């Protein structure tokens, strides 16, 4: 699996949503991107990867709610900075 490519796909997906998108819908998109990028069998690893990049930890809050609270653009900026895109 190409982890960086999967995260880039997540960022691209986040760029298509608005700040007003409900947290549940954001969470659904995160699951969909994970499944599309080879994490269907182990979504736990997908979220672990997101947490490691975003927070430097293996665990974290529900990402849909975090992104909704922190901000879509702010989350994208944070992830791009961590990935050095």
Describe the function of each predicted region.
Residues 1-85:
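Conserved nucleotide- and phosphate/pyrophosphate-binding catalytic cores
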